[in-house]
Amino acid sequence: MNRRTLLTGLASLPVLPLFSGFTLAADSPLSAQPPTRLAHPPSYWRDKVSAEAWKVLFEEATERPGSSPLDQFYEPGNYLCAACYLPLFRSEDKYDSGTGWPSFTQPIEGALGTKLDFRLLWPRTEYHCARCGGHQGHVFNDGPAPLGKRWCNNGVALRFVPADQPLPPLRG
């Protein structure tokens, strides 16, 4: 890559967020058969989740690292979207990434959609619940083998259901 190409690319970074609502941020389901997407506005969920969860899920905030009890929690079960209760992750895919957030090697197929996030200037892959659209976290390419992915989740955006308990009905 020559210097001119590099400088042109760097100079264009500040305008990329202006276009992210079109091609760069289009939801891309992780499976050919994602769950049916709900049409509720974010305000629908405000009285169904905590204020902190609502900020993360529907304003795309991030909880402080180390603040979630789910970070160092390793019981068998399933991790659901805190808003609509769609199962997102299985406990056997959870691992300690050392980041201070619950991390997983892979989601349940079809449970999440992704989009590019440019809030820190460089692109990151953000992921959302495929059903209610609630923001969960970001996926990085520094996870353990064999998949090499780290699905880094906000704990407040999750609800854990132990393996010996039935899953609650979907909400919404």
Q: What are these regions, as identified by a protein language model?
A:
Residues 85, 133, 156:
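Cys/His-coordinated zinc-binding microdomains
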Residues 81, 129-132:
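Short cysteine-rich clusters marking metal-coordination/redox-active sites
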